[in-house]
């Protein structure tokens, strides 16, 4: 009797991280990461432009929408980009299978990235993959149409990703100077993605005292909405604090403050000379910035012999909410007929509803925009004055005079009608309803209303 006994094959159990570049911008980002020899991640690029795809350094390439675009690109149409991705859904699904985490990088505002990225994100989510979007927004000089296209693409993409990081290209001017080349500027934006991926992979593959597993990372990044990534390196005195400061103040990101973040992933990497106190100082500085006692903060520390004398701090903050109240959309106070005092500090005031001002048939007071310069002018001298006498509605008990909103409406109308009024002083008076000196209120002719 012969027994055939085979030793079990060595199975490497480790999370698979995929960086998926979409369109021209996404492909360029992947090329830069390959140039930088990033370890611990697989790379895939997908494009509708066959020529651009051919020049990619990535081995795994997907030609999107062969029948839809014939390799000629999406023509800046997100609809075409989406159709191309849907046509190539099987290839996309195959490239993502067995991945535990995927970073989808693209440029918003064009055709392929804007249209295809949400489709790829949806497929990743259907496969149960932790999905992170890292995308750019156009420069201002690229025009309003491209910016609107980008915003629509972001809304679509955010439905399918666990975490979304937005890098406005316009923010490159914060760190660039007159000598910065165009290529170097885009590499700065790509470095945000590079640093974020490296921060995650280092925690799992680099040796260290405090290593994290993939479940820790998933706990911080799953279903967390908007996020920011940052990294900082420093040497010399106070290197840990300085590196942490650089990591938490990334000038390129759309949401550059991690205050109030619900999840935080911290990776502090250094050489064998890194001390306990330095790790403590860096971690505490980030915790202070987050300022949320309920935040899920996951910390790891690894060693890298190449960083002798240097400390690198990487941070991923997730669950960063957008502004709760849109700017310049303030309601008028029902009790005083006036705007909140802080309104006057804004450059533009947009009123969407006015409930307590009397209605006039000849003019609608809805959706009025008033420039601050037409409201906050100082009027002096004896030039012609505009006097508006308006019955007080819901008059305050103390009878104190309030700046009437109707006066601001009238001033806006005078300006928009190109009437030449040398504005020196606007006097807005409140007249007691019992004052019956005149049967007609002293207001502009087209607003006149006889007393009942």
Swiss-Prot record:
Keyword GTP-binding: yes
Residues reported to bind GTP: 24-28, 111-113, 142, 146, 190
GO terms for MF: GTP binding; GTPase activity
Coiled-coil parts of chain: none
GO terms under biological process: division septum assembly; FtsZ-dependent cytokinesis; protein polymerization
InterPro entries referenced in this protein's UniProt entry, alphabetically: Cell_div_FtsZ (IPR000158), Cell_div_FtsZ_CS (IPR020805), FtsZ/CetZ (IPR045061), FtsZ_C (IPR024757), Tub_FtsZ_C (IPR008280), Tubulin/FtsZ-like_C (IPR037103), Tubulin/FtsZ_2-layer-sand-dom (IPR018316), Tubulin/FtsZ_GTPase_sf (IPR036525)
Lineage: superkingdom: Bacteria
Subcellular location: Cytoplasm
UniProt entry tagged with the keyword Ligase: no
PROSITE patterns, per database record: FTSZ_1, FTSZ_2
GO CC terms in record: cell division site; cytoplasm
UniProt keyword terms in alphabetical order: Cell cycle, Cell division, Cytoplasm, GTP-binding, Nucleotide-binding, Septation
Binding partners and assembly: Homodimer. Polymerizes to form a dynamic ring structure in a strictly GTP-dependent manner. Interacts directly with several other division proteins.
PANTHER family in the record: CELL DIVISION PROTEIN FTSZ-RELATED (PTHR30314), MITOCHONDRIAL DIVISION PROTEIN FSZA (PTHR30314:SF3)
Similarity annotation: Belongs to the FtsZ family.
Protein task: Essential cell division protein that forms a contractile ring structure (Z ring) at the future cell division site. The regulation of the ring assembly controls the timing and the location of cell division. One of the functions of the FtsZ ring is to recruit other cell division proteins to the septum to produce a new cell wall between the dividing cells. Binds GTP and shows GTPase activity.
The protein, known as: Cell division protein FtsZ
Gene name of this polypeptide: ftsZ
